[in-house]
């Protein structure tokens, strides 16, 4: 399957769970025929229970619902939580679950990291937000900053077709009428052009990265990238510096208060290379950054699940939406500029690691390890990931007046 640019879409930016969850739950409540939901993490907390209730109500009124969770990201849902959904008819699957070894999860690599919802063939959501309370702004200092989009329009058919082709037990019909054409700058704000792109471990290994590289090559005035886990390869780093050196304002927002300390260490290894190449680097200090968004000039933007690190670019299953629309671009720019002004600290010379022989050695070793990490993982014993469907709980055998006790055989008096 290969998608082309689709015109005439309405796309709404959603910030954090505060905006994302109500929009998703409302769309599920309006579903008439089919719901498909994929996510990396679903916790059995307040947010997870609200999603559970919305899916349960939809299934009880006859809507066909399918849920795909990652076997590493969502390993601890209770049997009762899942069983109530499957009993109502929800098809519930885990992507490549594996038993723990000495209490540790071993299925770390090649994860299903997409976050997608499709409602009938009318509405879709794509982004980086999981289903857990930590995506709500009132969660506290560890609340995550993140983004998703709500989409209506022709591109929803592409997202649905992608899901149908990647779920088992379905036979998608070919859409011979689908148009493929080059995107042009949208002259009608609000009528967005959109392209659905994804990363897999087969024919689309570098599709998302290629669109980032193309964007950096074509940028004329401005690029803003906000990415939670930033440690890309040489090509993307070189493209960022090259754009900055030809006069493009290149701004990078990374985690200043990361949820994993190694993230900060990894990103700071790149500060010398980027800052001295003209890239403006900002550390987001308000709380952990979990977003994966970018914009270019006044019309290009992307929102999705893909980080710019070895796991997302070389191993995980990811999905992004690329958008050509001046109105959406301006909305995202206003949001990111507000973050830069109010919640970020720009990396200056005083924050750069000192260029000692020890720091240089650490940087070189760490950079090359992370750069070659996907190839090293590739040498591990390969297997075909599988989707494990959770069966409905077994129904207890019903006692009836006509049942015969095997120890007291005979006819009913």
Swiss-Prot record:
Function comment: Catalyzes the phosphatidyl group transfer from one phosphatidylglycerol molecule to another to form cardiolipin (CL) (diphosphatidylglycerol) and glycerol.
Name used for this protein in its record: Cardiolipin synthase B
Record-annotated active site: 113, 115, 120, 290, 292, 297
Principal location class: membrane
Positions of the UniProt region annotated as Disordered: 388-413
GO biological process terms on file: cardiolipin biosynthetic process
Reaction catalysis annotation: 2 a 1,2-diacyl-sn-glycero-3-phospho-(1'-sn-glycerol) = a cardiolipin + glycerol
Organism ancestry: Bacteria, Pseudomonadati, Pseudomonadota, Gammaproteobacteria, Enterobacterales
Membrane topology according to the record: Peripheral membrane protein
Family: Belongs to the phospholipase D family. Cardiolipin synthase subfamily. ClsB sub-subfamily.
Bridged cysteine pairs (disulfide): none
GO molecular function ontology, one term from the record: cardiolipin synthase activity
NCBIfam families: PRK11263.1 (NF008427)
Pfam families per record: PLDc_2 (PF13091)
Organism (species): Salmonella typhi
TM spans (from-to): none
CDD domains assigned to the protein according to its UniProt record, in alphabetical order: PLDc_CLS_1, PLDc_ybhO_like_2
Keyword tags: Cell membrane, Lipid biosynthesis, Lipid metabolism, Membrane, Phospholipid biosynthesis, Phospholipid metabolism, Repeat, Transferase
Residue span, PLD phosphodiesterase domain: 108-135, 285-312
Entry GO CC: plasma membrane
Nucleotide-binding found in the keyword field: no
E.C. no: 2.7.8.-
Top class in the EC scheme: transferase
Localisation: Cell membrane
């Amino acid at each position: 399957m290969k998608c082309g640019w689709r015109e005439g879409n309405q796309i709404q930016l959603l910030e954090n769970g505060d905006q994302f969850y109500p929009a998703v739950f409302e769309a599920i409540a309006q579903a008439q025929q089919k719901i498909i939901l994929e996510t990396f993490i679903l916790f059995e907390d307040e947010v997870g229970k609200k999603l559970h209730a919305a899916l349960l109500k939809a299934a009880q009124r006859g809507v066909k619902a399918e849920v795909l969770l990652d076997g590493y990201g969502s390993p601890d849902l209770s049997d009762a939580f899942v069983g109530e959904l499957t009993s109502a008819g929800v098809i519930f699957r885990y992507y490549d679950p594996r038993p723990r070894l000495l209490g540790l999860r071993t299925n770390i690599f090649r994860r299903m990291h997409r976050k997608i919802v499709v409602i009938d063939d009318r509405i879709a959501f794509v982004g980086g937000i999981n289903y857990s309370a930590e995506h709500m702004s009132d969660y506290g200092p560890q609340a995550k900053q993140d983004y998703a989009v709500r989409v209506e329009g022709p591109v929803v058919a592409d997202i649905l077709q992608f899901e149908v082709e990647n779920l088992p037990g379905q036979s998608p019909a070919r859409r011979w009428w689908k148009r493929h054409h080059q995107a042009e700058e949208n002259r009608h704000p609000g009528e967005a052009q959109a392209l659905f792109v994804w990363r897999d471990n087969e024919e689309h290994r570098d599709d998302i990265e290629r669109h980032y590289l193309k964007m950096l090559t074509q940028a004329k005035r401005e690029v803003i990238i906000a990415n939670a886990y930033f440690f890309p390869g040489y090509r993307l780093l070189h493209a960022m510096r090259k754009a900055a050196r030809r006069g493009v304002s290149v701004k990078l927002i990374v985690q200043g208060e990361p949820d994993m300390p190694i993230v900060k260490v990894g990103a700071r290894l790149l500060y010398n290379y980027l800052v001295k190449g003209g890239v403006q680097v900002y550390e987001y200090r308000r709380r952990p950054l979990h977003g994966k968004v970018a914009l270019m000039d006044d019309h290009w933007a992307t929102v999705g699940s893909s980080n710019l690190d070895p796991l997302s670019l070389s191993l995980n299953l990811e999905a992004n939406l690329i958008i050509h629309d001046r109105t959406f671009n301006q909305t995202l720019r206003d949001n990111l500029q507000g973050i830069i002004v109010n919640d970020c600290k720009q990396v200056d010379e005083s924050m750069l690691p000192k260029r000692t022989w020890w720091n240089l050695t650490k940087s070189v070793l760490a950079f090359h390890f992370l750069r070659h990490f996907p190839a090293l993982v590739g040498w591990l014993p390969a297997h075909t990931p599988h989707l494990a469907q959770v069966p409905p709980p077994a129904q207890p055998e019903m006692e009836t007046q006509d049942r015969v006790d095997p120890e007291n055989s005979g006819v009913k008096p």
